Amino acid sequence: MASFARLWIRDSSAGVGTLTFYEPESRVFAGLGHAICDVDTGEEMPLLAGDIVDAHINGCYKGTKGAAGELCGVFGNRVMGSLAVNGNTGVYGVMNAGNAPSGKAIPVALRQEVKTGPAQIISTVDGKAPQYYDVEITKIYSGPDTQVKNMIVEVTDSALIEKTGGIVQGMSGSPIIQNGMLVGAVTHVFVNNPLQGYGIFAESMLHTAENVAATQEKQAS
């Protein structure tokens, strides 16, 4: 499992997002933790085709109360993989051979294993190197109507607060680690309080990734 900054492209627009996890056997990756939506209508965009490319984060507009911040990045030259699904739990696709991200494998937590309390997120907020930052999971929603906004995460890391003001656009997909397990991904920031945001259960993203892997295997056979 590894976290890297990526740029997600559609038609004539692009945005910075974060890779949440990668499964090396199938080469399937997952990111964002929410759908890519049309900037004008807010509707989930149908996906015809798309690529992910490496990105270098070269700046940040800090988040403040009432104004969400944003990571600023530039495109790399190498296409890392192709997108296959844009859905409410995130974006999914297949990494090109030879482009596997580095990192060690960790288990994915079941939703009942996620607890309130200390955790960490992995995010790239400058350069290309992902870093761990301290957060607190303050609330967990586990009902049937909470498919995406499953938890509230609060940034407690002074270094991250100094750099970004908290959670900013572009950090969507940042893995949430607790007790040595991948428990979720950051999805949204609270505009009225950039220290806080929503997260999605990693288990939900894994289910979609497994479906993508099964589809890819079927198409290859």
Protein language model regions, located:
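C-terminal recognition in membrane/secretory proteostasis and scaffolding
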Residues: M1-S221
